[in-house]
Every structure is written in structure tokens, then in C-alpha cells.
Curated annotation (Swiss-Prot):
Organism: Mus musculus
Keywords (A to Z) from UniProt: Cytoplasm, Differentiation, Spermatogenesis, Tumor suppressor
Distribution of this protein across tissues and organs: Expressed in germ cells of the testis (at protein level). Also expressed in the lung and kidney.
Designated name of the protein: Deleted in lung and esophageal cancer protein 1 homolog
Quaternary structure and partners: Interacts with alpha-and beta-tubulin. Interacts with BBS2, BBS4, BBS5, MKKS, TCP1, CCT2, CCT3, CCT4, CCT5 and CCT7.
Null mutant phenotype: Male mice are infertile due to impaired spermatogenesis. Sperms are immotile and show an abnormal head shape and short flagellum, and are often accompanied by an abnormal manchette structure.
InterPro entries, alphabetized: DLEC1, Ig-like_fold
Function description: Essential for spermatogenesis and male fertility. May play an important role in sperm head and tail formation. May act as a tumor suppressor by inhibiting cell proliferation.
Name of the encoding gene: Dlec1
Length: 635
């Protein structure tokens, strides 16, 4: 039975292989039937024949179908890491990833997997628990190493920062000692050795400063003293040169001293001889010229050498008499050329013919601005206004110029448009600049533009923005009159704009000025500051138009009330308005009573709070007597 079952298994395996071969042959397109078999088909044929042979001899212990399904898929290779762009970097991870590939780049147990394994521990398997303990210890050691590396990196960075600060302080102190600061001083001694902890570096097997410093460390640092810098000390060759020069100077001084002594001796002998001869022959002494008293200049310089030195001095002096560049001098000056708009002043006739013309450097400008003042008017918030300013060269030489833009953010200067290349303006030609004005309110703005040339004088072009302000015909004091306490009185005032521009106005209490935001203060319709209220609080008036301002007076106390309101215009101008009102109580005067005033009889009952007493005469029943009272309002 066993042999029959084995034969049946071999037959089923061979039939399965043949069926797979048939499917592979059928899957080949019709156009490739005449060609040879593909490499995959031949490989499958070879593997199938080997499997059939193996199955024939009975080597496999599992079924063929189970063997095919048990093969695991090959893992995808890990991607290589990029090579660092810098050649000085010490990172070699890309080399390790290229050599070891999956062993280096593939993550066997990541952080997420290890965290989940440690959190879910509690298995009955002892080997699994031991593995988790070792994994937790490895993670703790790994975290400790990372913390130590971060601590070392932080310590090195702090030491480097302290070293840089100490170096800068030492360099600054050395610059104070040098009279003439050179372009770049030599570096000072570094203090990095004293800022780094050598024991900590050795503990973690790192290179410390003591490994490359051979001099012994002093027990305590030496006191700092003012010492001459190495850059200010003389070198060996310079010292030798100065020593040789000092010796030559000493020899020259000794030689001059000897010549002076000889000259003095000869002068005394000659003077005595000349005095004796003068007494004998007075007429001959007048004709003969006396010898020079100081012969030192004759001993040092010969006549040919003296002439050569004079020619050398004359040639050196002639080098300074060159033609000056007229661009560096104002016009109508000795070296500045002529002005095209300001003529030279002629000398007076009475003066000599050699009189020089009067030069003036203040009346002759180099560039003339057209227009001379940048003026903007009738502007609004939002648009950008432009103006072209032309600068004309008024001299007889071509000149360069530099225009400095305005300093305020409301004016901007565009690029210059020159008549030629290179930014040079020929005589009589003009260059143009566009000035932009960007207002953020309707107020007044002032700024200026500076035009600099190679001459020392600077041209100032003012920039102004003016808008005719609106003018309101509103009295500075608004009197609401008298009102009873607890009542309401409305007073109307006419407000007219007699200016030349449209204005938007906002009324607010004085305590709210200046506001953080006009949107928060400007209420629609009504603004209140007890006991007064003004409406409307926001309005707009065109030139020649008027509006009625209603002032509400609600007195709560007796006497005069006064409050101040601020009227703010959109051109940043304000106007203070004082609102005045008087609160009163009810006051009545009894002027006349028909029949006259009566007095109560003694003992007769009456109202003690009453001021007047009115008595009616006895009348019949159902009759109606009348008395007329005249009452006047005394408020």
C-alpha cells in the first residue's frame, strides 16, 4: 500500500509539472511559436525535470505544492545614502551603507517595535522575558551614550564661545595700545586651553588640549600686564638696519663737529689779520670783498652738486603744477571751469589791467533742478502720485552725480534716466528722476532729496505735500442754555465747510483722544459725554455744504455743566469744541390773585408748606365760585 501511494504521489506531481508546462507554452504569443523557447520556460523546464528526478528517487519529504508556496519573497535592497557635498566632512555613513548595504541600513528592531515589546511584556516564556531585559538594558545604554555625546558637544560649544569672547576682548585691548591701528592685527593667544575640561575629554576617550600642548600647565595663571605686541616689535633685520643707520649718523655728527671747530679757528685768524690790514689800507679794503663768515655750506655741497639739486627740486615742484580736473571744483573758480548760466564778474576799469576776475562759488550751481521744489496737492489716500524732476548740468564740463533718496516712507525715488551711458551728464543736458508720493493720510508731508556731485557743494531739493484743509464755521463754544434737571433739551447748530476740499469728520470725547483705533471710537449716529450728547458723530462735508449738529443736554445736577469734544478731520487736524449748559430746578412766581391775598385767622388750620393762602367766601350748595391766578415761570 505504501509503494502504491508513493507511485500515485509521483504521478500527481508529474502531471502537475506537465500541466504547468502546458500553461507556459500556451501563454507564449502566437508570433513567437516558431522561435526558440524563452529563458524562463527553459529554466522552468530544467527545474521541473530536476524535481521529477528528485521525486523519482524519493528525496523530498514534503509535497511539491507545499514546497513551492514555502519560498519567501526576496527583500528589496535598501537605498544608498547620498554622499556629503562638503569634502571636509567626517561622515562615513555613505561608505558603510555601500559596503554592508542591508546590514547597516536596515533597522532590525526600531524604537516603535522595542517600545511596544517592552510595554506588552508579561509572557510566560522565560527566554522572551530575558530577551526583553537585555533589550531594555541595551536601549538604556544607547540613550546614556546619546546623552553623553550631547553633553560633550554642548561643553565644547560653550568652551568655544568663551574662547571667542576672550579673544575678542584681548584683541580690543591690544588695539587700544597701538597708536596706529594696522589693517589687520596678528591673532592673539587662544584661551581655548583653559575653557575646556581635559579630564572630561579623557574620560570619554577624546583628544584633550593637553595632548597637543607640550608646555607644562602653571599652578596659577600669571597676572596680566601691559606688554608690547609682537607686531609692534622690531624684527632682527630692522634692528640691524637701524643700528647701522645710527652709527652713520654718529660718524656724520663727529665729522660736522670737527669741521665747525676748524671753521671757528680760521675765522678768528682771518678776522685779526683783516683788522690789522684795514687799519693800514682803508681804501683797498673797500674795493676787495671780504670772505664769507660761514663756510659750512661751501664745505658740504659743491657748485655742480648744488645746481643738480636745484634742478631736481625744480622738477619735483613742476610735477605739482598739473591741470586740475574741473569736476572736483565749483564752477567759476580758478580750476572749476565756467558756468553756463552765471557769467563772470568783470573787473572795474579803475583797477589795474592785471586784476583777476572775482570768483564766486556760491552763486554758480552745478546742477539746476526743474522744478526746484517737488510739490504735491489734491491727493487722496490710496493712489500713488508721481512727479518728474529734471537735473540740468549748468557747467562747461561733463559731470557725474549721485542722488540720495528721501528718508520718509511716503516718498520714493525711481531710477535715473540719463542722456548717455555711464551715468554722466554732458554740459547743458538733463537727467530725469521720478519721485513717487504714497500718502497714508491727508495731512502735510515734508522731505528732501540730496544731489551730490564731485564738487563740495550739495543741491537740496525740497519735497512738500500740501492739501487745502476744510474750514468749519462752528463756534468754539456751543451754549445749550438752561434746562430743568431731569429734562432733555435739543439745540441745533449749523456747521458749514467754507474750505476748498472735501473733509470727513469724527466727533469724540476729549477723554478718548488720542484713540487706539478710529473704528473703535467712531460710533454711528451719536456720541455721548454726560450730560451732553452730539449727533451725528461722523459726517462728511464738501466745500460750500452745511450740516445741522444736534446737541442734547440732559442735566442731572444744579448749576453749569461744561464738557469738551474733539472734532478730528481726515487730514490729521483737530478742533476742540466746548459744550456749555445750565441745569435748573422748577421756579414759579405768583403774580396776581383775583380778590387779593388772604391771611389765615388765628387758630385756623392751614398747610405749613404752602406759601400763599386763598380763601373762598361762603357759597350756596351746587354753586361754583372762581378765582383767577396769574403765575409766571421764573426759570
Amino acid at each position: 500500500m505504501d509503494s502504491e501511494s508513493k507511485e500515485e504521489q509521483q504521478c500527481t506531481a508529474s502531471s502537475a509539472v506537465m500541466s504547468s508546462l502546458e500553461t507556459q507554452f500556451l501563454s507564449v504569443p502566437h508570433q513567437l511559436e516558431s522561435a526558440s523557447l524563452s529563458w524562463s520556460i527553459r529554466k522552468s523546464l530544467h527545474s521541473s525535470t530536476v524535481l521529477m528526478d528528485d521525486c523519482h528517487f524519493g528525496f523530498p519529504t514534503r509535497s511539491l505544492r507545499a514546497g513551492f508556496h514555502a519560498l519567501p519573497p526576496l527583500p528589496e535592497p535598501q537605498t544608498l545614502r547620498l554622499r556629503p557635498a562638503s569634502l571636509r566632512t567626517q561622515e562615513i555613513s555613505h561608505l558603510l551603507a555601500r559596503v554592508f548595504r542591508n546590514l547597516y541600513t536596515a533597522q532590525v528592531i526600531g524604537d516603535d517595535l522595542s517600545d511596544s515589546l517592552i510595554k506588552a511584556r508579561g509572557s510566560e516564556d522565560a527566554r522572551h522575558e530575558e530577551f526583553l531585559d537585555q533589550l531594555q538594558q541595551a536601549r538604556a545604554i544607547y540613550k546614556q551614550r546619546l546623552d553623553e555625546a550631547a553633553m560633550l558637544e554642548r561643553h565644547i560649544m560653550q568652551a568655544r564661545a568663551r574662547d571667542i569672547a576672550e579673544t575678542e576682548h584681548t584683541t580690543k585691548q591690544s588695539r587700544l595700545q597701538v597708536v596706529e591701528t594696522p589693517v589687520k592685527l596678528p591673532p592673539v593667544k587662544t584661551a581655548f586651553r583653559w575653557c575646556l575640561d581635559s579630564k572630561l575629554m579623557r574620560k570619554h576617550h577624546l583628544i584633550s588640549t593637553e595632548d597637543y600642548y607640550t608646555d607644562p600647565v602653571p599652578f596659577c595663571p600669571a597676572p596680566k600686564d601691559k606688554s608690547t605686541l609682537g607686531c609692534s616689535k622690531l624684527t632682527f633685520s630692522c634692528e640691524q638696519r637701524f643700528l647701522r643707520k645710527s652709527e652713520l649718523d654718529r660718524e656724520a655728527e663727529e665729522h660736522c663737529r670737527q669741521l665747525t671747530e676748524c671753521d671757528d679757528f680760521e675765522y678768528t685768524v682771518d678776522s685779526l689779520g683783516s683788522i690789522s690790514k684795514a687799519k693800514e689800507r682803508t681804501t683797498d679794503s673797500v674795493k676787495k670783498t671780504s670772505r664769507p663768515k660761514n663756510k659750512k655750506w661751501m664745505e658740504h655741497l659743491q657748485v655742480p652738486q648744488r645746481a643738480l639739486d636745484r634742478r631736481l627740486l625744480a622738477s619735483m615742484e613742476n610735477r605739482n603744477h598739473f591741470l586740475k580736473n574741473p569736476r572736483f571744483f565749483p564752477p567759476n573758480t580758478p580750476h572749476g571751469g565756467k558756468s553756463l548760466i552765471v557769467p563772470l564778474s568783470k573787473p572795474e576799469r579803475r583797477a589795474s589791467l592785471n586784476a583777476e576776475p572775482e570768483w564766486s562759488c556760491t552763486d554758480a550751481p552745478v546742477f539746476l533742478a526743474k522744478p526746484s521744489v517737488g510739490f504735491f496737492t489734491d491727493y487722496e489716500i490710496g493712489p500713488v502720485y508721481e512727479m518728474v524732476i529734471a537735473l540740468q548740468n549748468t557747467t562747461s564740463t561733463s559731470r557725474f552725480l549721485r542722488v540720495l533718496p528721501p528718508s520718509s516712507p511716503y516718498f520714493a525715488l525711481g531710477l535715473g534716466m540719463f542722456p548717455g551711458k555711464g551715468g554722466i551728464v554732458a554740459p547743458g543736458m538733463t537727467c530725469q528722476y521720478i519721485v513717487q508720493f504714497i500718502p497714508d493720510c491727508l495731512g502735510d508731508f515734508d522731505d528732501f532729496i540730496l544731489v551730490e556731485t564731485q564738487s563740495p557743494h550739495t543741491l537740496v531739493i525740497p519735497l512738500q505735500a500740501r492739501r487745502p484743509p476744510p474750514v468749519l464755521t462752528l463756534s468754539p463754544v456751543l451754549d445749550c442754555g438752561h434746562c430743568l434737571i431731569g429734562g432733555v433739551k435739543i439745540t441745533k447748530f449749523i456747521c458749514k465747510n467754507v474750505g476748498f476740499s472735501v473733509g470727513k469728520f469724527c466727533i469724540m470725547p476729549q477723554k478718548s483722544w488720542p484713540p487706539p483705533s478710529f473704528r473703535a471710537v467712531a460710533t454711528t449716529g451719536f456720541v455721548e459725554q454726560p450730560p451732553f450728547g452730539v449727533m451725528p458723530s461722523v459726517f462728511e462735508l464738501a466745500p460750500g455744504y452745511a450740516i445741522l449738529l444736534e446737541v442734547l443736554f440732559l442735566p442731572t445736577g444744579l448749576g453749569q455743566a461744561e464738557e469738551t469734544f474733539i472734532i478730528v478731520c481726515d487730514n490729521c487736524q483737530i478742533k476742540e469744541v466746548v459744550v456749555v449748559g445750565t441745569g435748573q430746578l422748577v421756579a414759579l412766581d405768583l403774580i396776581h390773585i383775583s380778590g387779593g391775598k388772604n391771611e389765615p385767622d388765628p387758630g385756623e388750620l392751614k398747610d405749613l408748606t404752602a406759601q400763599y393762602f386763598i380763601r373762598f367766601e361762603p357759597e350756596n350748595v351746587q354753586s361754583t365760585p372762581k378765582k383767577q391766578l396769574i403765575i409766571r415761570n421764573a426759570t
